[in-house]
Amino acid sequence: MAGQLNCYLQDNLLVNPFQSAYKTGHSTESALLKIKSDIHLSLSKGHSSALTLLDLSAAFDTIDHALLLERLSLEYGLSGSVLKWFTSYLTNRRQSVKIHDTLSSERQLLYGVPQGSVLGPVLFTLYTAPLSKIISAFSSLSHHLYADDTQIYLDLTPNTITSSIEQLQKCLSAVQSWMAENKLKLNPDKTEFIVLGTEKQQTKLADHFPIDIMGNKFSPCSKVKNIGVIFDSTLSMSKHVSLVCKSCFYHIRDFSRIRRLLSKSVAVTLANALVGSRLDYCNSLMHGITKKQFRRLQAIQNTLCRIISHLPKRASTSHARKLLHWLPVEYRVKFKLLVITYKALNTQQPPYLSACLNEYSCNRSTRRSNPNNKFLNIPVYTHKTHKSKRHFDCSFEIAAPTLWNSLPLHVRTAPSVISFRSRLKCHLFSLAFPP
């Protein structure tokens, strides 16, 4: 049923383009990549940005069944036996709690979607879809949703900060009113607000804070945790790199204690699960970080490689990593970003990233203008400062086509995602470990 519902929503263009949860071709990484890219482009113009992260209290447990069914009927066109099926699915559910050998009496569930179900999360996104319409009514604000995580961000300049903050406050007031009407509750204690920009910009804007949001005073945080990724106030990703290093080395210590008990193949599998997954989580957002930060991340992979291969503490790991078929961390970042680019170009998913990419076109006949070569257009930087140029280069609109155009033709023209990943890894492997 979940598959049929998703197909129906897509075929009838009823999918919320700003919601990235529970949708094919979408992920936390694609959502964060879009948000981070938009903010980088704002900073590249010499502006600063404000990002507000909204938190809902027990969001999946407070959905009103009657309101949800009404929304499915009026806004999504479900009727007849289909609507009756959803009514039967949601209503007359009962729940009890068992502690040791004691079972409580049953109570009927009047609110919430079934926990652990496939349909529950999809129904939640449909229930909260009107949030996008409310936020979109404020033209100076941008937003993105991932399940119950709502993010609102906007440009700030010294000339427009007062009006921009007023728009944000009005928007949040409208969001809060809608949530109250729909049995949802914002959690002000976990709502976070951060201003992103240079230290000089933040000093100039300091007089405008704290601001009043939903009756609470908010001063900008120095960092926020955004769907598992740390955004610091300069968007340097240094805080996130530190978090990744701390988490990875914690698991490496545990791994080193049991390595002697494991075969090499099991050790590699466990290392990838415990440490590799943390290195690779949303790692496309690492594009553009400093060489020093990449060295810190590479040290994790090197240490892990030495433990697996029983190498001395200071031994070189280049040959061992080559035998393990491990790309260096910096190349893994490029690999992930290029795979996302390939999917955006060839599947048009997610649409908000696909819209950032344009094929190269030129009136003159050149090698790049040949559509068979699949080159992408790279926007030209028109501002002056070096610091702003860094942000420009870090945006998806610039980083993706720059990396894409550097690939050999046989990689760019791969017929499938599987083929592209294979050819891309071979190409990057040859660059990382030249013969």
Placement of each model-derived feature along the sequence:
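Hydrophobic/basic alpha-helical segments
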Residues: 3-435
